[in-house]
């Protein structure tokens, strides 16, 4: 079974830690955000990555493109305006099934 990883600042990640998620990448700078995303992309055991929406904007275009094109891990951004439709599309892309139908 694939794991869930979280990338965010300490305030963002604390709730996930309390929920029992152990693959946490706490970041406090733009450089740490890039490094954390690069690290999680190298892992074969992570299926979903939860990341703050604003952090995606701080990634280099090449890295953002890689995230968009990969099926696994699937990146789910939290705190943006995409809402349910964005999450629906990401899940459909990851597993090949539209769970809302």
Swiss-Prot record:
The Swiss-Prot or TrEMBL record describes its family as follows: Belongs to the V-ATPase F subunit family.
What does UniProt give as GO cellular component? plasma membrane
What's in the keyword line of the UniProt record? Answer: ATP synthesis, Cell membrane, Hydrogen ion transport, Ion transport, Membrane, Transport
Topological relation to the membrane, as annotated? Peripheral membrane protein
GO MF annotations in UniProt: ATP binding; proton-transporting ATP synthase activity, rotational mechanism; proton-transporting ATPase activity, rotational mechanism
Its recorded name reads A-type ATP synthase subunit F
Record bears the keyword Transport? yes
Q: Name one GO biological process term.
A: proton motive force-driven plasma membrane ATP synthesis
Organism for this UniProt entry? Archaeoglobus fulgidus (strain ATCC 49558 / DSM 4304 / JCM 9628 / NBRC 100126 / VC-16)
- SUPFAM superfamilies listed in its UniProt record: AtpF-like
Q: Does the keyword Cell membrane apply?
A: yes
Q: What does this protein do?
A: Component of the A-type ATP synthase that produces ATP from ADP in the presence of a proton gradient across the membrane.
Oligomer and partners: Has multiple subunits with at least A(3), B(3), C, D, E, F, H, I and proteolipid K(x).
Origin superkingdom:
Archaea
**Pfam families (alphabetical):** ATP-synt_F
Q: Where in the cell is it found?
A: Cell membrane
């Amino acid at each position: 079974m694939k794991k869930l990883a979280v990338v965010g600042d300490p305030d963002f990640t604390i709730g996930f830690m309390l929920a029992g998620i152990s693959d946490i990448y706490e970041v406090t700078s733009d450089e740490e955000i890039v490094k954390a995303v690069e690290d999680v992309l190298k892992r074969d055991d992570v299926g979903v990555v939860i990341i703050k929406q604003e952090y995606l904007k701080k990634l280099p275009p090449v890295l953002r493109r890689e995230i968009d094109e990969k099926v696994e891990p699937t990146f789910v951004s939290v705190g943006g305006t995409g809402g349910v439709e964005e999450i629906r599309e990401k899940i459909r892309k990851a597993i090949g099934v539209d769970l809302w139908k």
